[in-house]
Amino acid sequence: MTWMIRDVPKDSRPRERLLASGPESLSDHELLAILLRTGTKDESVVQLAQRVLQHFEGLRLLKDATVEEMTSIKGIGPTKAVQILAALELGRRIHQSGYNDRYVIRCPEDGAKYVMEDMRFLSQEHFVAIYLNTKNQVIHRKTVFIGSLNASIVHPREVFKEAIKRSAASVICVHNHPSGDPTPSREDIDVTKRLAECGRIIGIELLDHLIIGDQKFISLKEKGYV
């Protein structure tokens, strides 16, 4: 027999609890159980959901899991894996949709908020350029490169070529520290100074360089490097 949500005692069923008390009342594994719908012959869907989260050490790693990684778990086939991935992607798109309508960056906090959820859990360093118009509205965002930050790799040409193409008035550069600690390195500072100087020469201001950690960030402009 395959365990389904209806086989769970009624007062413990995630769907019924969501209807009665709202989604915020459910735990992570209960929400996941609703997506999975069925368990296995040996465990309920709630138990399966708990095991999936334990496998990925919670939502943080589940967020970036692949179909192959999910289907390696007993009880998770391609259909369940696709359901989970679709829900995760919808969540990402909903989060981003709030910022796509000409998001305005007035201060470092605005810039960090714009990218924090996308960048704080990345396992590699991503260097991103955010292009703004004269009203400080975001007109484009581009990942310039992925990998350890190095002055020989981050060429200003790659950053400002897109700025010219988009007729941007200014640029904010952002990169993440996978360690979660946004403290700038010597390379971070050198890259920032080089980009700021090139921006002054061509007339497209580097407004800031933000380093993203885990729910925290550092503005190199506030530190005096821009």
UniProtKB/Swiss-Prot annotation:
One record GO biological process: proteolysis
Annotated GO MF terms: metal ion binding; metallopeptidase activity
Domain of life (superkingdom): Bacteria
Residues covered by the MPN domain: 104-226
Motif (JAMM motif): 175-188
Keyword presence, Zinc: yes
Name assigned to this protein: UPF0758 protein GTNG_2548
